[in-house]
């Protein structure tokens, strides 16, 4: 009887877990212009690129930070 209770418990838990909906990942909205619009103009872009492991960066005419390889 005890084996049956344990088996039913695990069967119900497996059914519960498999029936629950999978949560969708939230999309991350990245704003690339933030480093070129803030105080410091291109300096913040360079620091951002250096922190990501690049050799530097610059802001283009659309105020988007571009990192050098």
From Swiss-Prot:
Annotated signal sequence range: 1-19
Tissue: Expressed by the venom gland.
GO MF terms held by the record: potassium channel regulator activity; toxin activity
Cysteine disulfide partners in this protein: 36-59, 45-65, 49-67
One GO-annotated biological process of the protein: defense response to Gram-positive bacterium
Localization: Secreted
Predominant cellular place of this UniProt entry's protein: secreted
Keywords: Disulfide bond, Ion channel impairing toxin, Neurotoxin, Potassium channel impairing toxin, Secreted, Signal, Toxin, Voltage-gated potassium channel impairing toxin
Domain of life, per lineage: Eukaryota
Gene3D superfamilies given in the database record: Knottin, scorpion toxin-like (3.30.30.10)
Record flagged with keyword Thylakoid: no
Positions of the propeptide removed during maturation: 20-33
Family: Belongs to the asilidin-12 family.
More info: Is abundant in venom, since it accounts for 45.2% of precursor counts.
Protein function: The recombinant peptide moderately increases Kv11.1/KCNH2/ERG1 currents and shifts the voltage-dependence of the channel activation to hyperpolarised potentials. In vivo, induces neurotoxic effects when injected into insects (tested on L.cuprina and A.domesticus).
Protein name (database record): U-Asilidin(12)-Dg3b
Species of provenance: Dolopus genitalis (Giant Australian assassin fly)
Upper classification of the organism: Eukaryota, Metazoa, Ecdysozoa, Arthropoda, Hexapoda
